[in-house]
C-alpha cells in the first residue's frame, strides 16, 4: 500500500471512530458554540498526527527518489563515464530493464506520477529486454573466467586478476564504479537459474555481503533483498554439496523472516543430513567451472587472451621483420604501408595505419544503422550463438567512395582480386559487452557450408582491419600458432586461410578475445579462391 493509500485508510479509520450518531447529528452546527469549536481541536490533532506520519513517509520516499535521480544524473553528466566499461554497461541495461520499472511502479497514481508512468510506458518497448540483462550478466561471468577476475574486486569497480596470492591490475578506470547488492544478485541469479553454481555462489556471496552492510536501507529501484540473496545462496551451496553453509545461511534467513515455513523445513532437512553424515560438516566443497563441450582448446585460448602482445619478437626469431611495403604496386609507390611480419607459420602480417581516423569513422558510421546479431554457419544454416557475441553489417563498395578506395588499397597490398564474386562485401563488426568469438576457422570446413553459395570457392585469405582501439582485452589469438595480436587502431591483419593446395591451414584457428574494456570495431574482407588462379598459383606441395 502506497503513502496516499495509507493516508486514505487512516482517515477512514478516524472517520469511523468519530462516527457516533449524536456527534454526526451535531456536526452541522459546530460553529454555533465555542465549546463545540474547542472539541474540534482534538480530532484535528489526531489528523495532524496522521498527516505528520504520512509526510515523514513521503519525505523518506522523496529522499530515496532524489538519491536515485542524482545517482543516474551524475553518470550522464560525467563525460568520463563510458559504457565501454562492462560494469557500467551492465548496470545501464539493468537500470533500463529493471530499476526504472521498479521506481515507476512503486509510485501512486497522482496526476504528476501518472504522467511519469505514461511516459515510461511510451518508451518501454525501446528499453532493453530481460534477455539483454541475462546476456550482460553472462558477459560479466565470461570476463570473470577468461581474465581470472576477482568478483569482490569487480563489485568495487576494480579489474584485478587473482592467481593464488598474486594480484594483477588489468585495467585502472579513471573513476571507480561499484556494484550494489542488487546488481550482484542479478548476476548471481542468472547463473543460479542456469544451474551454474560455480558462478552463482561468488556473485550471491557478494550480494549477501553488500545487503548486510546496508540492511534496513530502502532503495526503490532494488528488486531483491538480503532475504532473497540468502535464500538463493543457501540453495546454491546445497546443490554444490556444502550442506553446512546452506544450513547457516538458512538460519540467518529465519532471523529476518521467522515465519517462512519453506526455509524452516530446509533447516530441518539440512540438520538431518548433517546428523546422518557428520563428515559433510567439515568437507571442503570444490567448485568446478562448467565445461564447454565445443571448446577443446579453452586453456590455450584463455592463456593467450591474458597475455598481451604474446607474438614472437624479431630478437628471438630473426626472420620476423618490419618494412615499408609497396608490393611493387604503383598505387603504393608514394605511400608505402608499414608492414610487420608477426608470424611465419601461419603467415600473419600486421599493416600499421592502414586506414585513417576519418576513414575508420566513416566505415563505422555507414555500418551502424544496419548492425544485426552476428551468426555462424551451422550445417546449411546460419544461427546466432553464445560463443560469438557481436553485431555485424555488410557494406557494398558502391555505398561510399571510401569503400572503393579501401578495396583498391587491399588489392594493391595483397595482389589479389577483391571484387565480387571473388571476394565478399566488407563485413563490419561491433562487439558487445564482453564481446568475443571463440576459436574458429574463417574458411569452410564442411562441403555444406553456406560459404560455397557464392560459387567462388573457399575463403583463401582474411584481411581484418581494426577500426577502433580498446582499453583492455579484445586481442586476436591464434591458438595453434600460440600467439596473440592486440588491437592496434587503424591497423590491419592479413593471413592465408588455405594452403596453395587448396587445403585448409589448421594453424589459422583463431579467436577474438573478450573485450574487457572498450568499444571494439573491426572490418573483415574475405577473399575467395576463384579469381586468384594467376595471382596465387596452386601447388601440390603441402608446405606451401
Swiss-Prot record:
It comes from the Eukaryota. Its EC number is 1.14.11.2. One of its GO terms (cellular component) is endoplasmic reticulum lumen. It is an enzyme of class 1 (oxidoreductase). Residues 107-131 form a coiled coil. Its cofactor is Fe(2+); L-ascorbate. 2-oxoglutarate binds at residue 520. One of its GO terms (biological process) is collagen fibril organization. It catalyses: L-prolyl-[collagen] + 2-oxoglutarate + O2 = trans-4-hydroxy-L-prolyl-[collagen] + succinate + CO2. Fe cation binds at residues 440, 442, 510. Heterotetramer of two alpha-3 chains and two beta chains (the beta chain is the multi-functional PDI). Catalyzes the post-translational formation of 4-hydroxyproline in -Xaa-Pro-Gly- sequences in collagens and other proteins. This is Prolyl 4-hydroxylase subunit alpha-3. The gene is P4HA3.
Amino acid at each position: 500500500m502506497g503513502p496516499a493509500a495509507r493516508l486514505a485508510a487512516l482517515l477512514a479509520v478516524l472517520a469511523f471512530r468519530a462516527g457516533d450518531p449524536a456527534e454526526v447529528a451535531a456536526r452541522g452546527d459546530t460553529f454555533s458554540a465555542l465549546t463545540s469549536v474547542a472539541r474540534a481541536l482534538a480530532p484535528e490533532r489526531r489528523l495532524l498526527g496522521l498527516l505528520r506520519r504520512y509526510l515523514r513517509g513521503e519525505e523518506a520516499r522523496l529522499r530515496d527518489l532524489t538519491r536515485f535521480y542524482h545517482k543516474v544524473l551524475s553518470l550522464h553528466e560525467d563525460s568520463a563515464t563510458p559504457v565501454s566499461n562492462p560494469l557500467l554497461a551492465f548496470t545501464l541495461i539493468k537500470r533500463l530493464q529493471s530499476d526504472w520499472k521498479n521506481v515507476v511502479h512503486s509510485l501512486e497514481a497522482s496526476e504528476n506520477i501518472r504522467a511519469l508512468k505514461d511516459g515510461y510506458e511510451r518508451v518501454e518497448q525501446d528499453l532493453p529486454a530481460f534477455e539483454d540483462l541475462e546476456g550482460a550478466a553472462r558477459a560479466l561471468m565470461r570476463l570473470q573466467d577468461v581474465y581470472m577476475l576477482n568478483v569482490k574486486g569487480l563489485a568495487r569497480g576494480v579489474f584485478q586478476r587473482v592467481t593464488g596470492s598474486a594480484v594483477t591490475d588489468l585495467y585502472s578506470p579513471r573513476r571507480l564504479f561499484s556494484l550494489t547488492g542488487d546488481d550482484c544478485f542479478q548476476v548471481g541469479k542468472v547463473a543460479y537459474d542456469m544451474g551454474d553454481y560455480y558462478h552463482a555462489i561468488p556473485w550471491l556471496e557478494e550480494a549477501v555481503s553488500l545487503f548486510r552492510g546496508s540492511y534496513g536501507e530502502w532503495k526503490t529501484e532494488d528488486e531483491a533483498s538480503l532475504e532473497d540473496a540468502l535464500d538463493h545462496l543457501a540453495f546454491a551451496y546445497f546443490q554444490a554439496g556444502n550442506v553446512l553453509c546452506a544450513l547457516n545461511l538458512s538460519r540467518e534467513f529465519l532471523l529476518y523472516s521467522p515465519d517462512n515455513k519453506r526455509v524452516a523445513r530446509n533447516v530441518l532437512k539440512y540438520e538431518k543430513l548433517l546428523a546422518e553424515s557428520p563428515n559433510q560438516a567439515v568437507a571442503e566443497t570444490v567448485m568446478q567451472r562448467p565445461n564447454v563441450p565445443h571448446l577443446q582448446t579453452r586453456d590455450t585460448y584463455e592463456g593467450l587472451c591474458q597475455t598481451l602482445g604474446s607474438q614472437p619478437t624479431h630478437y628471438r626469431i630473426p626472420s620476423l621483420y618490419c618494412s615499408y611495403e609497396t608490393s611493387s604496386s604503383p598505387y603504393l609507390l608514394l605511400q608505402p604501408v608499414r608492414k610487420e611480419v608477426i608470424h611465419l607459420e601461419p603467415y600473419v602480417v600486421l599493416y600499421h595505419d592502414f586506414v585513417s581516423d576519418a576513414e575508420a569513422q566513416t566505415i563505422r558510421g555507414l555500418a551502424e544503422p544496419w548492425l544485426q546479431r552476428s551468426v555462424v554457419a551451422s550445417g546449411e544454416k546460419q544461427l546466432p550463438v553464445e560463443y560469438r557475441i557481436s553485431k555485424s553489417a555488410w557494406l557494398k563498395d558502391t555505398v561510399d567512395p571510401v569503400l572503393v578506395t579501401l578495396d583498391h588499397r587491399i588489392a594493391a597490398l595483397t595482389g589479389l582480386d577483391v571484387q565480387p564474386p571473388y571476394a565478399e562485401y566488407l563485413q563490419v563488426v561491433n562487439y558487445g559487452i564482453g564481446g568475443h568469438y571463440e576459436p574458429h576457422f574463417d574458411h569452410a570446413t564442411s562441403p555444406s557450408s553456406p560459404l560455397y553459395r557464392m560459387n567462388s570457392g573457399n575463403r583463401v585469405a582474411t584481411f581484418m582491419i581494426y577500426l577502433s582501439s580498446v582499453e583492455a582485452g579484445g586481442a586476436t589469438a591464434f591458438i595453434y600458432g600460440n600467439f596473440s595480436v592486440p588491437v592496434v587502431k587503424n591497423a590491419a591483419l592479413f593471413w592465408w586461410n588455405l594452403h596453395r593446395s587448396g587445403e585448409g591451414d589448421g594453424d589459422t584457428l583463431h579467436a577474438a578475445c573478450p573485450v574487457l574494456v572498450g568499444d571494439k570495431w573491426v572490418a573483415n574482407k574475405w577473399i575467395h579462391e576463384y579469381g586468384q588462379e594467376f595471382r596465387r598459383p596452386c601447388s601440390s606441395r603441402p608446405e606451401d
